[in-house]
């Protein structure tokens, strides 16, 4: 009988039986054991089976794969524990022994018992080592915590001495600042997705997965694919100091940006938008040019282009927290934020516009150069964030006297009333909000009686005879108020009158109007005190209110501006700059005409004041000097412009029948 048939009868497979005493027996040694018993190895580097510490005998080479994983798991604190083959290897040996002779079976059982005893010893050693490791970890953890506390103390000392601080996250119990800006609400797409869903907002704008491009986004705006590639525009921010969690920055213009600013001022004087477009081709992120061109597009009713041009100036900027408002370079940044906020409100994103309003106010809350306090109440009501408006009024009334502004005097009670109309609040909170709303609206009507009749006229509501004929709310109340107060009232009514058109609000307002009339007829001393206060407080509006009125573009408020403001030349990129404006660089003046110039050039300069030869213009870093042909071309263009403006009147040729030109007199 052949060996193949004999193996089949025994149930064995080829390659599993041992070929010899040391043919396929490999011994796995630890590194330390291998070093100690290295000289004792026999020929071929093999170790005898029963010498010293028993290693792992492997009859199948593929069992070595599982042993590597076992060795990695049994490494504790850099030491290796004694172990045997894994269960899979031992079970495999047992399975093969069952099909063999009885002697092999007995040998397999003995090996299994020995393996189990060795495993128990190894597990006991592992438990002891784990306990030691836990003790070591606890000791090292305590020492590391003490080290971190020492590091924190050192950092606090350094911050106190240098003035620099690294603000950490506030504790959970602390309340956020009233002007805290939530970055997730600065993205208008987030608000639009909440209203209409992501599919309706994005639509076909979703790029394919393979063609997806991830541009560098900022908190203020998200760049579009149609925008020019961003490069260093020459506008940078320098950290002045960091103190008590606030960072103070200063905007700096490079030399190239200053040259672009000079070209922009020349383009504005030319009154030609195409010159600004040509400037943007070389300086695509020049802020003043983008603001001016956005206004030109808005006047031409191209709202989409105007909104994109406003978003570009905010792209390269970070969020500054600066105190020096009178510094000229960042004036454009304020205007860009304000105009972007206006576009967001018109787009139907009042929650995002409220965050922009908080951002602008947080940059300079004391000075408030754009007078955002005249607008933040309107944004809060439009966003239906009544709790925020009430909180702002409660925290700032003590030191800012917000009740002296007509917009806060009427918006805060309106917020209380709208809050009392919500059904998800308890009954006692609803009743207290209604009482507070009635109390505040009566104080507002007593302080500003000239608001009622124009408000009812805006809402197309005709008051009853007792109100319209009363002297307190009659026409005299509107005429007798100071001009500065008239500006504030016109600004508030032109912006927020539609918030009062609901029937429930009008019925509530009517009740409180009658309460005020009863107090006036009864001779309440608060009425006379409010009248005296109006005469003292509203003598003349400050410059930031005039600037806010110009930026708002509300016709009624602009018409109420004083004559000294309306007669000034107001530029869209620089409306009513502060009186104490500090210019970081001075625009070079044009060269005055010289007497020894060319006679033809002097003649055309007398006819065309804007004409200048190439030699008289400043050389803005152009290598090679001016070209003579360019001066000749400018001269020819000036001649053509002059000839195009000439108009010749043809003399009447006398008729043949009346050669002397004598006519009959009627």
Curated annotation (Swiss-Prot):
Residues 41-53 have a biased composition (Gly residues). This is Ribosome quality control complex subunit TCF25. One of its GO terms (cellular component) is cytosol. Residues 100-110 have a biased composition (Basic and acidic residues). It comes from the Eukaryota. The keyword Cytoplasm applies. Keywords: Cytoplasm, Nucleus, Phosphoprotein, Repressor, Transcription, Transcription regulation. Residues 1-59, 79-146 are annotated as: Disordered. Belongs to the TCF25 family. The modification Phosphoserine is found at residue 592. Pfam families: Tcf25. Component of the ribosome quality control complex (RQC), composed of the E3 ubiquitin ligase LTN1, TCF25 and NEMF associated with the 60S ribosomal subunit. Interacts (via C-terminus) with NFATC4; the interaction leads to suppresson of NFATC4 transcription factor activity and is reduced following stimulation with angiotensin-2. Interacts with XIAP. It is found in: Nucleus; Cytoplasm, Cytosol. Component of the ribosome quality control complex (RQC), a ribosome-associated complex that mediates ubiquitination and extraction of incompletely synthesized nascent chains for proteasomal degradation. In the RQC complex, required to promote formation of 'Lys-48'-linked polyubiquitin chains during ubiquitination of incompletely synthesized proteins by LTN1. May negatively regulate the calcineurin-NFAT signaling cascade by suppressing the activity of transcription factor NFATC4. May play a role in cell death control. Residues 125-137 have a biased composition (Basic residues). GO terms for biological process: regulation of protein K48-linked ubiquitination; rescue of stalled ribosome.
